Design a protein with these regions (language model features):
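Conserved N-terminal/central alpha/beta ligand/cofactor-binding core
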Residues: 12-14, 72-187, 191-193, 204, ...
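Short beta-strand "acidic-cap" motif of Rossmann-like dinucleotide-binding folds
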Residues: 66-71
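Glycine-rich loop(s) and the adjacent beta-strand/alpha-helix scaffold that form part
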Residues: 215-297, 492
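A conserved FAD-binding loop/helix module that cradles the flavin
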Residues: 255-262, 269, 476-500
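A glycine-rich dinucleotide-binding beta-alpha-beta segment and adjacent secondary-structure elements
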Residues: 397-477
Length: 502
């Protein structure tokens, strides 16, 4: 093909593509205008009733603001209430009891490494420095109960540092936050869908257009109401892992073939709206898949507790050739990508532990093993031979792999993959044995709105804070945190909004 004909071909292709695009253009939703009259006025509006939103509401109210929390779903809590109930707290009593040396510097470094250094170092530092005080806040102010004997190690962390709520669920925190809101007189309004965020002609966020009586997922349901915010709006609307079309826009491989750990309301409407009003967004294509998910369960389930707290910490993960293929305590992206690679070869990933690992999990979450084994979420075997046969794993290869793991347990040095071998890891020499398939599910949106350290949302055109708009939790990018991120920055966002001066 000559240069001229190639140029003509490309021009024709571009024109043709433009014609096709113009034929299917749908106008973007217009920005909502400031109403002539507001239906209701409060000081601070919080959007979302998970860890971050409720923490924000509590702090804003304590600072003297009149606060309302808006939740689009019929029940409060979002993903937080079905969360696994673990959070990181460097220097907590559980670490001290187990003789684990840790520091703020090490936690900050681990977060930066797990985030591939795409995180904002200043925000990471704030998170690390305030992790312990926020753990103490949940205990002393909210009355959250934790298992004081157990400590766990999350993937990507160089030492064990996460603690467990006593009930083994994020509800152990959310319920206490809801109780505190009620005590403080904060209304948590359910079925309240935020349709538009309203900026005035000076660029300030002054309120919201809301549909009360909303019936998910019917966008035109409910009655429209305009609520003004004298001081500020705090956005804590979470991620979009349950929104297949929106997540595929950012990561095309995440089709409807992938399940999600999230509740159905984890959708992208407010992600689109914040684009529409000019909020800067970062790293939205960084969508985390939970590598420890059990395909036998819908949603988050409980199978992940075995895969992580028993097999990854005290056992091993192998493919169906009987070979280890990843550091079981690497960060979630590394492990998920490794499983995807095995699955692409027609293999499956199997998490294995013996009774010792199961006992460790049981100590952290009393009663959990019965809940796992009786419905066959996790399978139990008297012999290694029976396990290998059930998963079609070559027995000799599995025994060889176990011998390597047992050598690492003795030397405290995992030469093949560099897994952290804690002092309580023991060689796996006796049964009974437990095993389960693990396959990633869409779990967490690492990107989101760009904010400053004080949680003010930044404008995409000016890079400056949008007056009256704050955000925390999963809808914020550049931190790569988790539960503790929601608590630390949720509280800060509520305080920032309550103290905002017009």
């Amino acid at each position: 093909m000559t240069n001229q004909s190639r140029r003509s071909f490309l021009q024709g292709s571009i024109v043709g593509a433009a014609a096709l695009a113009s034929a299917s253009v749908v106008q973007a939703a217009p920005r909502s205008k400031v109403p002539a009259k507001w239906d209701e006025t409060v000081d601070v509006i919080v959007v979302g009733s998970g860890f971050a939103g409720l923490a924000a509401a509590i702090e804003a109210r304590k600072a003297g603001a009149k606060v309302v929390v808006l939740e689009k779903m019929p029940t409060p809590g979002g993903n937080s209430i079905i969360n696994g109930g673990i959070l990181t707290a460097t220097g907590c009593p559980q670490q001290l009891k187990h003789g684990i040396k840790a520091s703020v510097d090490l936690l900050a470094q681990d977060i930066l490494v797990a985030g591939a250094y795409l995180n904002d170092p200043a925000k990471v530092r704030v998170l690390a420095e305030h992790a312990l005080s926020n753990y103490e806040w949940t205990v002393k102010e909210l009355g959250v109960e934790y298992n004081l004997d157990a400590i766990g190690q999350e993937g990507g962390h160089s030492v064990p540092r996460y603690v467990f709520t006593k009930n083994g669920s994020g509800s152990g925190i959310v319920r206490k936050e809801l109780d505190k809101c009620k005590e403080l007189g904060v209304e948590v309004r359910l079925r309240a869908y935020v349709e538009h965020i309203i900026r005035d002609d000076k660029g300030r966020v002054v309120g919201l257009e809301v549909r009360e009586g909303y019936r998910f997922p019917k966008k035109d349901s409910g009655k429209v109401k305009f609520i003004a915010a004298r001081k500020g709006v705090v956005l804590c609307y979470g991620g979009f892992s349950a929104d297949v079309k929106f997540r595929q826009m950012h990561d095309p491989k995440l089709t409807d073939k992938f399940s999600t750990t999230n509740q159905p309301g984890a959708t992208g409407e407010l992600w689109r709206e914040t684009y529409n009003i000019g909020c800067a967004q970062i790293q939205n294509d960084w969508i985390q898949c939970g590598p420890w998910s059990n395909p036998k369960e819908k949603g988050m389930g409980i199978g992940w507790t075995f895969t992580q707290s028993a097999a990854a910490e005290y056992g091993l993960w192998v493919n169906t050739k009987g070979q280890r293929f990843v550091n079981e305590l690497a960060n979630r992206k590394v492990r998920a990508d490794a499983i995807f690679a095995e699955e692409a070869k027609g293999l499956k990933a199997v998490a294995i532990a013996n009774q010792y690992g199961a006992d460790k999990l049981e100590a952290a979450r009393p009663g959990i093993m019965k809940k796992l084994v009786e419905p066959n979420i996790v399978s139990k075997y008297d012999t290694l031979e029976a396990l290998a046969k059930d998963f079609n794993i070559p027995l000799d290869e599995l025994k060889k792999t176990l011998a390597q793991v047992n050598e690492s347990a003795k030397t405290k040095n995992d030469k093949p993959f560099g897994r952290y071998i804690n002092n309580e890891f023991k060689p796996l020499t006796e049964g009974p044995w437990y095993a389960a398939i693990t396959s990633p599910k869409v779990h967490h949106c690492m990107g989101g709105m760009a904010t400053n350290v004080a949680t003010a949302v930044l404008d995409v055109e000016t890079d400056q804070p949008i007056p009256g708009l704050f955000a925390a939790g999963e809808c914020v990018g550049g931190i790569h945190g988790a539960v503790m991120d929601c608590l630390v920055n949720g509280r800060q966002a509520g305080l920032s909004a309550a103290k905002y001066k017009l």
